[in-house]
Amino acid sequence: MKTIFFGTPEVAVPYLEILNRYTEVVLVVTQPDRPRGRGMVITPCPVKETALKMGLKVLSPEKITDIEADLKAAGADYGIAVAYGQILKQHIIDIPKLGIVNIHFSLLPKFRGAAPVQHTLFAGETKTGVTAFWIDKGMDTGPVFAYKETDILPSEDAKTLFTKLISLGGILLEDVIEYIRLGQIVKIPQTKNIFTPQEDGSMFKEELPLPTYAPMIKKEDTILDFNNFGAETFFNRVRGLACGPHAKVITKINGKEDLLQIIKASLLEKNKQCPPNMPRGSVVSIENDGRILVKCYDSCIYIDIVRPAGKKDMTAASFANGHKIKPGDVIFY
């Protein structure tokens, strides 16, 4: 079958490779070439680079509507979109005969939007997955085609979870391609209850989850506050921001305020207690394993790895010792 691929960043490359393996990719659509790297040299995106190496036709319009005629001329049976980066209007969605399927890194309707992996971790979810859905005019609101689910381990952060979901999504895309080849087109509404007939003649009502949203990460999302963040919330925010921009805290050392990036944090072991009377933002202990224990809103949390402004990653203990910080000092705000 003939297909069009819509995608831009590195995470989308494996999906183009899969689509090209099983279908005839007649057109690849990406975001325009942008300045990248230290020299800010105009460079094609990863999907475009890969597509050109494959010998595929690539278009990179500023606006998708600029290539409407090319999309129609391609004569595609369906499209696949992965992190394309532009909203597709209904008249564009309708061009491929069957429509366009998007691969989204959450279990829709939960975490619709640009940053589903980050917000899934912010929320402390223990399960997530990848959803293939038919694009409509809404933001990730179209009917579900298929999905795959996976557990989230406490040790996982945005980096490791992205890696897992990219792989899982590849398996899902292979399923989608095969379903379409066999004519098994599925469209399940995201937010309407599903009624399934039972053997006794009754109807089983499946309650679908309410939609939640995952907007693009803003600067204010990265600033953590020991006075108002509990240990679980702090830990989950650090995990969710592991791909960058990283979590940051305000430090005040010798009268100087600065922002310190938190690269890794960990929860207090269940068999250990947090001193109840120490002020929030104070250093409780400096551990031999390189961590420091800090008092937060409702408990204590370990800070493992930090990145001071203009410097490389280091253990939190190295940072503390370098600034002659000792237990009891209040340095975080």
Curated annotation (Swiss-Prot):
Protein biosynthesis as UniProt keyword: yes
GO molecular function terms listed in the Swiss-Prot or TrEMBL record: methionyl-tRNA formyltransferase activity
Family matches, as InterPro entries: Fmt, Formyl_trans_C, Formyl_transf_N, Formyl_transf_N_sf, Formyl_transferase-like_C_sf, Met-tRNA-FMT_C, Met-tRNA-FMT_N
Keywords: Protein biosynthesis, Transferase
Residues annotated for (6S)-5,6,7,8-tetrahydrofolate binding in this entry: 106-109
Cysteines joined through disulfide linkages: none
Enzyme Commission number(s) of this protein: 2.1.2.9
Keyword set includes Transferase: yes
Catalysis: reaction(s): L-methionyl-tRNA(fMet) + (6R)-10-formyltetrahydrofolate = N-formyl-L-methionyl-tRNA(fMet) + (6S)-5,6,7,8-tetrahydrofolate + H(+)
CDD domains per UniProt: FMT_core_Met-tRNA-FMT_N, Met_tRNA_FMT_C
A single cellular component GO annotation: cytosol
Pfam families, alphabetized: Formyl_trans_C, Formyl_trans_N
NCBIfam families from the UniProt entry: fmt (TIGR00460)
Similarity comment text for this entry: Belongs to the Fmt family.
Record function comment: Attaches a formyl group to the free amino group of methionyl-tRNA(fMet). The formyl group appears to play a dual role in the initiator identity of N-formylmethionyl-tRNA by promoting its recognition by IF2 and preventing the misappropriation of this tRNA by the elongation apparatus.
UniProt name for this protein: Methionyl-tRNA formyltransferase
Organism: Elusimicrobium minutum (strain Pei191)
